């Protein structure tokens, strides 16, 4: 009795099935590389954010962010947002009044929003590939399935028999490509949804941080205006 291994089913079913399985194997390899890389990067980023946030909670003035932004050994989204706000603040004039206080705060807020959007793009990097892999892999597997069934039907016509030994190679190859497609799609789909959820969660986290930093800026600006007015009244 002839035995059929998985490798025999794949390599004995023709060049087309080999190409399909090869594409799925390459997609799986790249997908897992992306998944592992993003997991490690997210853990590293989370630790950097936690350290920066702990230091941020110790300060009470917006200008003190300068000291927190000096250490750039590890990439930190919160530091990037803070630097963007500080750069925008440095462009403002030194004249603060009740009339321009709102407009000054708006400029800082817009800068924070741009930084958050930039970080969202960074967080979502390679998510598109995982989405494509999750959506196309089952169809590649289905294509291999259809091809395997067609090969079995061709073998039946060629040999004039529907015995198992005749149809088994084609049917086996069809099942192998189907399984391969699912093995690629399931992890890619799960990872895509997980990373997308984390990207959305991080965006909210970064936006909230920007709001806290903006509130600190507003308090300092308001204190400066009140100080100037108090001096004018005293004089």
Regions found by a protein language model. Name each.
Residues 19-36, 133, 137-143, 180, ...:
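Lipid-exposed faces of alpha-helical membrane segments in multi-pass integral membrane proteins
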Residues 1-54:
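Hydrophobic membrane-targeting segments
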Residues 14, 32, 65, 82, ...:
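Residue-level signature of catalytic and energy-coupling elements of molecular machines
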Residues 11, 21, 125-128, 132-135, ...:
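Internal alpha-helical transmembrane segments of multi-pass membrane proteins, especially GPCRs
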Residues 47-140, 147-163, 190-235:
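Predominantly long cytosolic amphipathic alpha-helical stalk/bundle segments
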Residues 173-190:
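Hydrophobic alpha-helical transmembrane segments of polytopic membrane proteins
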Residues 25-28, 40-41, 171, 203-206, ...:
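Structured catalytic/translocation cores of nucleotide/phosphate-coupled proteins
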Residues 160-174:
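Hydrophobic alpha-helical transmembrane segments and adjacent short intramembrane/lumenal linkers
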């Amino acid at each position: 009795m002839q035995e059929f291994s998985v490798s025999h089913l794949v390599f004995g079913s023709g060049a087309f099935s080999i190409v399909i399985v090869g594409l799925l194997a390459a997609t799986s390899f790249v997908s897992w590389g992306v998944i592992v890389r993003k997991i490690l990067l997210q853990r590293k980023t989370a630790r950097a954010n936690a350290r920066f946030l702990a230091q941020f909670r110790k300060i009470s003035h917006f200008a003190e962010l300068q000291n927190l932004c000096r250490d750039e050994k590890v990439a930190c989204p919160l530091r990037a947002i803070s630097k963007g706000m500080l750069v925008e603040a440095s462009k403002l004039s030194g004249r603060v009044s009740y009339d321009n206080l709102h407009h000054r705060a708006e400029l800082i807020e817009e800068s924070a929003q741009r930084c958050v959007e930039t970080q969202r793009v960074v967080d979502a990097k390679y998510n598109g590939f995982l989405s494509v892999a999750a959506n196309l892999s089952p169809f590649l597997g289905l294509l291999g399935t259809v091809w395997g069934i067609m090969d079995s039907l061709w073998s039946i016509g060629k040999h004039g028999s529907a015995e198992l030994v005749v149809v088994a190679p084609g049917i086996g190859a069809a099942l192998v490509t189907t399984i391969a497609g699912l093995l690629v799609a399931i992890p890619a789909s799960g990872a895509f949804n997980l990373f997308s959820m984390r990207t959305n969660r991080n965006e909210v986290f970064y936006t909230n941080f920007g709001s806290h930093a903006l509130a600190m800026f507003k308090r300092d600006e308001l204190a400066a205006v009140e100080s100037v007015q108090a001096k004018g009244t005293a004089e």
